[in-house]
């Protein structure tokens, strides 16, 4: 199945503690989850690893969020949108369903 959400896409959170916040996708995981910049921050208790020079303590980092809880953000309409696929000049492209604009990659 083709990926509707890709790395560097601007997305908006639809459900959860960060509902309504916007961010950029930094990583797409194969498990159907994504990591979004500045969204779903969790505190991780990091053990020190002197051999690697890693300091211990409580570190705040982004956790994965399910793809079903986010939607791509359409800058033209200013709202969350759905993605469709079509072929143009022999290439498969993504487009916004609300206004048929092609999503820039």
Swiss-Prot record:
One of its GO terms (cellular component) is ribonucleoprotein complex. SUPFAM superfamilies: Translation proteins SH3-like domain. CDD domains: KOW_RPL26. Keywords: Ribonucleoprotein, Ribosomal protein, RNA-binding, rRNA-binding. It comes from the Bacteria. One of its GO terms (biological process) is translation. One of two assembly initiator proteins, it binds directly to the 5'-end of the 23S rRNA, where it nucleates assembly of the 50S subunit. One of the proteins that surrounds the polypeptide exit tunnel on the outside of the subunit. This is Large ribosomal subunit protein uL24.
